[in-house]
């Protein structure tokens, strides 16, 4: 079953690192997807699910950094699969080992306890440009390496694919690939500045101007705004 763009999109930042977590569904009372459950968001996710009578069909991860995946196991709760690109799958084994020591120390100081990681039980590995139908939502996986090897964006089309003239993307969950006025870092382990440039040129810039961008950090934006004002997109060409 393929639906039009979702009508229920709830986003909120985690207390740590202000990582945006999103809950997306076609409507209240239906299945949903949870995107990037970061540090300490599990209770907030449960509240959203209860308030809107939602049932999680999948947990989608834009990449494997700790601030985007830390609550994936409690949110999945042994009943829901976590989806991550195959190139970032190794990070779910122990994301604590793939981050800067300073980031880990900052997190432990903020929460006053040692970070503990549990790998999710059911993990589905994604490929680039893969199509998914989860919670009745048509999703496209856009592989956009640079911030990490397996960074992806999740695109939701405005109308179902297969309809004439329907290859228009209305909403993109951009993770740490694209922010309002900026892009994700490439100096962390697994980052690659050249790969990021290629992703921006070949994956991000072709998105239609009307695309709503829901980033991993900071406010929502549009491709029209970013194309005109984001300094990291200037000079790359369409």
PLM regions and their residue ranges:
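Short Gly/Pro-enriched turn/cap motifs at secondary-structure boundaries
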Residues: 12-14, 121-123, 143-145
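Short acidic/glycine-enriched loop/turn segments that link adjacent beta-strands
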Residues: 16-18, 126, 148-150
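Short Pro/Gly-enriched beta-strand edge/turn motifs at strand-loop
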Residues: 2-8, 110-114, 135-139
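Active-site HxH/HxHxD metal-binding segment of metal-dependent hydrolases
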Residues: 39-43, 47-133, 159-162, 228-236
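Conserved beta-strand hairpin/beta-sheet module of binuclear metal-dependent hydrolase folds
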Residues: 2-52, 154-166, 170-173
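Metallo-beta-lactamase
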Residues: 30, 40, 98-102, 137-237
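Conserved S/T- and glycine-rich ATP-binding loop of Class I adenylate-forming
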Residues: 24, 62, 144
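Hydrophobic residues in well-ordered beta-strands that form the structural core
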Residues: 35, 83-84, 174, 215
